[in-house]
Amino acid sequence: MAAQGAAAAVAAGTSGVAGEGEPGPGENAAAEGTAPSPGRVSPPTPARGEPEVTVEIGETYLCRRPDSTWHSAEVIQSRVNDQEGREEFYVHYVGFNRRLDEWVDKNRLALTKTVKDAVQKNSEKYLSELAEQPERKITRNQKRKHDEINHVQKTYAEMDPTTAALEKEHEAITKVKYVDKIHIGNYEIDAWYFSPFPEDYGKQPKLWLCEYCLKYMKYEKSYRFHLGQCQWRQPPGKEIYRKSNISVYEVDGKDHKIYCQNLCLLAKLFLDHKTLYFDVEPFVFYILTEVDRQGAHIVGYFSKEKESPDGNNVACILTLPPYQRRGYGKFLIAFSYELSKLESTVGSPEKPLSDLGKLSYRSYWSWVLLEILRDFRGTLSIKDLSQMTSITQNDIISTLQSLNMVKYWKGQHVICVTPKLVEEHLKSAQYKKPPITVDSVCLKWAPPKHKQVKLSKK
C-alpha cells in the first residue's frame, strides 16, 4: 500500500460538485421547446462486402452515442483492450463537454457509405422540421443555464486569451481518458475524465478500488484477495459528525498521505479542471460516508487548505456518481459553511467551479438566502447576510442578481425584495429545501488551536 501512492500525482485544487438533480454524463437533456435530437436513427446494415474507410487518428467521423444519436466525433487515440480482446477508439464529441469522451468499438463509427447516408438523410429531415418551427428567442441567462445543464463546451473564441491558452495546455495533457471504468464497493462506475494513476495503472481500461482504504488494483483477483485481508472499515482520521447513518470524518493530509493521494486520484476521474499536487499535506479532507453493519461507505468529500490566502473554505468537492441527486452535494456544501461559522469567517469555494458545481452552489446559496429573507422583518444588508451565513458578499450579490433581488443604486448594491417574489422562488424545485441538512448539534468540531488564537485576537 505504501509504495502505491508514493509517486502518484494527486488532485486537490479546483472545486467541482458533481450533480444534485442535473442530467448525468450520458444524458442529453433537451431545452424546452426544441425539436428532437438530430441523427437518432437505426441505420441499415451495410451491404455485404461494402468497403469501410480506415479509421485515422485526428480525423472526424459520425459516432453513435449511448443514447443512439449520431454526432461528429474526433478520434483521439486507439488501443487494444486486453481485458475485452478488441480494438477501441477514444473519441471526443465535437461541441460537447469532455466528460462525454469515451472509448468505443469500431461498429459505433459510421465507416460505410450506407450508414453515413442514412444518418445524413435523418439529419436533413431534422433540419427541415426545425426550420418550420416558429423562431424562439432565448435570453443570455437562459442560454447560460441551457449550456450548463447540457454540458455545452465553450469554444476557444468565447474565452479570453489567457483562459484559452491555459485550456489548450490542460486539454493536451489530459486528452485521453485511459481508465474507462472503476469498481468500488458495490458499484461499477464510468470514469468522466483523465486521472494520472502511476505506471501501468493509468493505462488500464478498468481499475478495482477498495472502498475503505482506497487502494487501487489492476486485476479483480488482486481486489478479491485484498478484500479478505483489509482491516479498514472506515476512513482514517477522526469522526466529527454522526446522525443516523450519515457520518463525516476529518482526515489530515499530513497524517494519512497515501489515503488522501488515492482519494484525489479517484476524484480526478470525475473532475476536469484540477491543480495536481504531489503533496497533500497542506490540505484537510472531510469524508462523507453512509454507515451500515459492514462499515462506513464513502459517498463524497471536500478538501480545504489549512491556510487559504484567498479565504477559500473548499478546495475540491465531489459526490461520487452513484450517490448523486440524493442531496449529498448540498450537504457537503452546507457542512463547509458550518465549519466556517465555527471559525467566525466567511468563505467561498475555489474557482473556477465545474458546470455542475456552479449549479449546486447557486442552488444552495439561493435556498439559504431565500429562507432568511422569507422570515426576516426589518432592514437587512448584504453584509448582515454574509455574517449570518458565512457566504461571501460577492457570492451573495451574484446569487441575488440571478434571483432579480438586488439593484445597484447610488454606488452600492441594495436588496429589493417582496414576500411574493420570495415565495415564488421557494416554490421552484430548484430552490427547495435539501433532503439532507446538517444538524449542528451533531457536529463535534472546533477550529485548530492556532486559528483559535487568531480568533481571540480579533
UniProtKB/Swiss-Prot annotation:
Residues 55-110 form the Tudor-knot domain. It is an enzyme of class 2 (transferase). Zn(2+) binds at residues 210, 213, 226, 230. Residues 174-458 are annotated as: Sufficient for interaction with KANSL1. Acetyl-CoA binds at residues 317, 319, 325-327, 329-330, 354, 363, 408, 432. The modification N-acetylalanine is found at residue 2. GO terms for cellular component: chromosome; histone acetyltransferase complex; kinetochore; mitochondrion; MLL1 complex; MSL complex; NSL complex; NuA4 histone acetyltransferase complex. The active site is at 350 (proton donor/acceptor). The keyword NAD does not apply. The modification Phosphoserine is found at residues 37, 42, 348. Changing residue 350 to Q: Abolishes histone acetyltransferase activity without abolishing non-enzymatic 'autoacetylation'. Abolished ability to regulate mitochondrial gene expression. Residues 1-53 are annotated as: Disordered. Propanoyl-CoA binds at residues 317, 319, 325, 329-330, 354, 363. A zinc finger (C2HC MYST-type) spans 207-232. It comes from the Eukaryota. It catalyses: L-lysyl-[histone] + acetyl-CoA = N(6)-acetyl-L-lysyl-[histone] + CoA + H(+); L-lysyl-[protein] + acetyl-CoA = N(6)-acetyl-L-lysyl-[protein] + CoA + H(+); propanoyl-CoA + L-lysyl-[protein] = N(6)-propanoyl-L-lysyl-[protein] + CoA + H(+). SUPFAM superfamilies: Acyl-CoA N-acyltransferases (Nat), Chromo domain-like. Changing residue 98 to Q: In LIGOWS; no effect on protein expression; no effect on MSL complex assembly; decreased histone acetyltransferase activity. Component of a multisubunit histone acetyltransferase complex (MSL) at least composed of the MOF/KAT8, MSL1/hampin, MSL2L1 and MSL3L1. Component of the NSL complex at least composed of MOF/KAT8, KANSL1, KANSL2, KANSL3, MCRS1, PHF20, OGT1/OGT, WDR5 and HCFC1. Component of some MLL1/MLL complex, at least composed of the core components KMT2A/MLL1, ASH2L, HCFC1, WDR5 and RBBP5, as well as the facultative components BACC1, CHD8, E2F6, HSP70, INO80C, KANSL1, LAS1L, MAX, MCRS1, MGA, MOF/KAT8, PELP1, PHF20, PRP31, RING2, RUVB1/TIP49A, RUVB2/TIP49B, SENP3, TAF1, TAF4, TAF6, TAF7, TAF9 and TEX10. It is linked to Li-Ghorbani-Weisz-Hubshman syndrome: An autosomal dominant disorder characterized by global developmental delay, mild to moderate intellectual disability, speech and language impairment, and variable facial dysmorphism. Some patients have seizures and autistic features. Brain imaging abnormalities are observed in some patients and include decreased white matter volume, enlarged ventricles, thin corpus callosum, and gray matter nodular heterotopia. Belongs to the MYST (SAS/MOZ) family. Histone acetyltransferase that catalyzes histone H4 acetylation at 'Lys-5'- and 'Lys-8' (H4K5ac and H4K8ac) or 'Lys-16' (H4K16ac), depending on the context. Catalytic component of the MSL histone acetyltransferase complex, a multiprotein complex that mediates the majority of histone H4 acetylation at 'Lys-16' (H4K16ac), an epigenetic mark that prevents chromatin compaction. H4K16ac constitutes the only acetylation mark intergenerationally transmitted and regulates key biological processes, such as oogenesis, embryonic stem cell pluripotency, hematopoiesis or glucose metabolism. This is Histone acetyltransferase KAT8. It comes from Homo sapiens.
